[in-house]
């Protein structure tokens, strides 16, 4: 992956987190993406989210597929484990890694071409299997590496930079994640870090399949009049359903709010999602209502953003598979080959 090394010097008084790390310790090399690319804003949001959550970089595994979006893990969390897989296959690689070692925090980064076209089957199965992961789709509506053709998430009626009209129906990744059983579903905009950073933090702390559809304008091929993924269009049609604040489980929870305007959602690890309702009739715990809301707003030409759905009691793959709590590379021969007596007991249980 192409990159430019970043100077390691920084101000001696740069703030540190509880681990003693500065924000620079969560960065990577200098990005080689186009100047102004929305993907770089998402990378910056990931850096800040991990820094503020005091996450040890070596405990994070970042995985990606192929595309502009899949280049971005090079540019953040330089001290983390990384794997750049083949086109559309990141979800399967992530699932296998998660099964082998549940102790890591898994962050999958993909794009609308990588996950909504060639990798759509991989995406759907990873979500329905309840893999404990954060899955971010950097959604720009075009194939940026191959000069701006429409992707599967491009809206019907959208116009390409060359003036071509898209006649195909768009795939809504957030709706598909809801249908497949994701227990944390959000949508955001790369140009809104105030909204995006807490959404990423909430996803990182969520013990289940967390999905974020992040609209990320392509400044080279999809930031013009007629595009429904441009900076101007998204800003004009963005309708936030709520504003999320992330309260770390290790911090004292001090909340001052008016009844009916804020909802607190406590997760298994003690972290708290503080939701400031903007759409008063929106229920973040109703999966069916969330799907209906997305469809209704799509017909109105609006782009709902914010935390769309969260299940405070999520199911997670290791829980229902009853897998070992130890990483596979720590299992000894006695654990893997318990002997003839154990085999006979297993066979007897199946008769």
Regions found by a protein language model. Give the residues of each.
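Short catalytic-loop micro-motif centered on adjacent basic/acidic residues
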Residues: 35, 108-110, 184-189
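Solvent-exposed alpha-helices and their adjacent loops that cap or buttress functional pockets
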Residues: 26, 35, 53-57, 98-102, ...
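Glycine-rich ThDP/TPP pyrophosphate-binding loop and its adjacent helix/strand module
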Residues: 117-118, 125-133, 138, 142-283
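Thiamine diphosphate
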Residues: 1-144, 197, 327-351
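Conserved active-site and cofactor/substrate-binding residues in soluble primary-metabolism enzymes
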Residues: 40-45, 57, 88, 92, ...
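Flexible, low-complexity linker and terminal segments
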Residues: 2-19, 220-351
């Amino acid at each position: 992956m192409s990159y430019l090394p970043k100077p390691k010097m920084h101000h001696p008084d740069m703030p540190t987190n509880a681990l003693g790390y500065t924000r620079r310790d969560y960065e990577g090399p200098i990005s080689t993406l186009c100047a102004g690319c929305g993907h770089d804003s998402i990378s910056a949001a990931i850096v800040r989210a991990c820094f503020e959550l005091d996450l040890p970089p070596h405990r994070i595994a970042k995985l990606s597929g192929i595309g502009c979006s899949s280049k971005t893990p090079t540019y953040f969390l330089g001290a983390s484990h990384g794997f750049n897989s083949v086109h559309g296959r990141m979800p399967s690689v992530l699932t296998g890694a998660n099964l082998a070692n549940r102790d890591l925090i898994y962050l999958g980064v993909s794009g609308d071409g990588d996950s909504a076209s060639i990798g759509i089957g991989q995406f759907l199965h990873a979500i329905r299997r309840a893999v404990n992961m954060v899955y971010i789709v950097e959604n720009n509506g075009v194939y940026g590496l191959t000069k701006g053709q429409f992707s599967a998430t491009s809206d019907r009626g959208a116009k390409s930079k060359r003036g071509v009209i898209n006649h195909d129906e768009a795939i809504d990744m957030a709706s598909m994640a809801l249908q497949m059983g994701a227990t944390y579903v959000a949508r955001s905009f790369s140009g809104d870090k105030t909204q995006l950073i807490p959404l990423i933090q909430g996803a990182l702390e969520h013990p289940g399949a967390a999905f974020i559809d992040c609209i990320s304008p392509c400044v080279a091929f999809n930031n013009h009049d007629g595009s429904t993924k441009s900076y101007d269009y998204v800003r004009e049609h963005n309708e936030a359903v709520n504003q999320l604040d992330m309260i770390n489980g290790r911090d004292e929870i001090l909340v001052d709010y008016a009844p009916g305007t804020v909802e607190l959602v406590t997760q298994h690890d003690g972290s708290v999602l503080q939701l400031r309702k903007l759409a008063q009739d929106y229920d973040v715990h109703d999966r069916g209502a969330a799907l209906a809301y997305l469809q209704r707003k799509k017909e109105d030409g609006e782009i709902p953003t914010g935390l769309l759905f969260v299940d405070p009691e999520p199911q997670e793959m290791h829980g229902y598979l009853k897998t070992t709590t130890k990483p596979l590379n720590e299992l000894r021969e006695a654990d893997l080959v318990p002997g003839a007596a154990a085999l006979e007991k297993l066979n007897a249980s199946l008769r």
